[in-house]
C-alpha cells in the first residue's frame, strides 16, 4: 500500500504563516533649492525658447514648401542671364543682390506673417499653454525669442540665396566674389526691416488675441497702410513701417551719402520695434484672460515698476531719435513728395 507521508495531523487546517515585515523609515533632510533669476537664467531661457521656436519653423511643411518655391524662382531667374539691350553682362555682385531681393521679398513676407501667428498660437493649439505660462519666465524673453527666431529664418533663407548666387558667379567664370557686399547690403536694406516687421507682427498677434484677424492686420500694416498713405499723398519714411532712404550700391561711391540717414531711420524703427515687444510682453495672455480690457487691468497690477521704467526709457529714446530725424528731414531740408521732385 502506498500512502502520502505528512508531518501534519490529518483533518487539521493549515494556516498560512504570515511573516511580518518590519518597515524601516529613513529620515533625511530635503536639499535646499536656491532659485536664481538673474541675467544668466534669462539668457538660458531665451536660448531655450529661441531654439524651440526656430526648429519648429524649420520642421514645418509650410516653410519647406515656401523655401522650395523661392529657390525655384531664384534659380530660374539666374538661368535667365543678365542681358541688356542685346548684350550679355557679367554676373556682378550688386546685380545678383537685386535679383535675390526681388526673388525672396514676397516669400519672406509670407513667412513672417504666417509664422508670427503660428508661434504665438502653437502652445494654445496643443493645449499646453497653461503649463508653459506657469513656468517662471518673463513674457518679454519668450516673445523676443519668437521674434528673433523669425529673423533667424530669414537669415537662413538669405544665406542660401547668397550661396546660389556665388555658385552662379563661379560657374560663369566671374571670380570677383564680394562677400562683404552681400553681407552689408543684407544688414542695411533687409535685416533691419525683418527685425521691425517680426516685432510688430508679434505685438499684433498678442494684442488682438485672434490668429486670423492678426494675419489680416499684419498684411494691412505691410501693404494697405502704404496704399492709404499714397492716397493721401503722404510720403514720409517716419510713418511707413520700416521705411528709410533708398540705398543703391555702385562701384564708384558705394552705398552713397544716404547711408548715414538710413542708419538713423534704422535706429528710429529698431527702437519702435523694441517698444512693441515690451508692450506685447506686458499684455501677453498667460492664463485664461482673453479680452484686451482685462489684459490692461492685469498689466497695471502685475507689471513691475522696473518694467514700466524700461518701457518709458525706450519711449523717451524713441521720441528723441524721432525729433532728430524730423528736424533733419523736415526742418533743415525741404520736404518734397515724389511728384514735386519730378517737376
Predicted regions and their residues:
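Hydrophobic cores of alpha-helical transmembrane segments in multi-pass inner/ER membrane proteins
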Residues: 1, 107-114, 190-200, 267-283
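Terminal transmembrane helical anchor/hairpin motif
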Residues: 1-2, 212-298, 322, 327-338
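Aromatic- and glycine-rich beta-strand/loop motifs that create alpha-glucan
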Residues: 26-67, 288-298
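Hydrophobic alpha-helical transmembrane segments of multi-pass membrane transport/permease proteins
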Residues: 61-83, 103-111, 217-227
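Secretory targeting signals
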Residues: 78-79, 91-107, 144-209
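Long, hydrophobic alpha-helical segments
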Residues: 99-122, 126, 157
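Helix-loop-helix units of permease transmembrane domains in multi-pass membrane transporters
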Residues: 117-153
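Hydrophobic membrane-insertion alpha-helices, especially the h-region
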Residues: 311-325
